[in-house]
Amino acid sequence: GKSLRYLFDSSAQTGKTSHFGVTGLLQAQGGYYVYDSTHNYAAYNANKNAFDIYDTGGVGNSSHQGQFFPFDAADKVFNEENDRLVQNGITADNTASYNGGKPVNHHFGLSMSTRFVQPDGGKTNKDEDMTFEFAGDDDVWVFIDDVLVGDIGGIHDRASLNINFKTGDIKVNGKSDGTLLSKYQEARKDGDTRWYGSTFADGTNHTLKFFYLERGALYSNMELKFNLVTVPESDIIKFDQDGKF
């Protein structure tokens, strides 16, 4: 199939704008980095090249309140009542007439790259399993060392991915989807690193790349939670297919 690299890299493409080094989406909570559109609306602020995070979810639909539409500013999705923000009724349906002439901005993507080290026994210094978790809609792909270890692309409702670095187990929608070792074996890259059972050997260094693509022109919600023991090097890239902020 056709590579989607052009959607996430810095190449010039018709109808595409890229934003590099964007900050502010992930919040530190109890040893984890987290973001959940259910509870916190996120809007991209071009002047700061950062996300503005709000203390309530924005944009709703019948099945999941709190959507991820970062190219729609807060004043488009909220009203202010009694000094607090309330949803103004705009929904994820991309129909101008339904949304009173204000359709939300679909067709965008986000990518994140971070280096991490496998801690002793796959546990953090808080004695918790090191994990990477995602839940949401639309497409998500997770690569480690350029090996596809998490794939929830295609047509689907809200889906989940869990990678446990203590055990090496990978689950999609709560069901087993192999292990880190089996994914590397399928890619014929298991010889590129050291192993302890089905997970990485202690002290090995790796690079995780996360790709999120909203292409369905309907729902867009995202929940991220991870406690990777990181090497200080990360970046976030955002782009809007229509070139809008």
For each of these PLM feature ranges, what is it?
Residues 1-240:
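Acidic/polar, compositionally biased interaction segments
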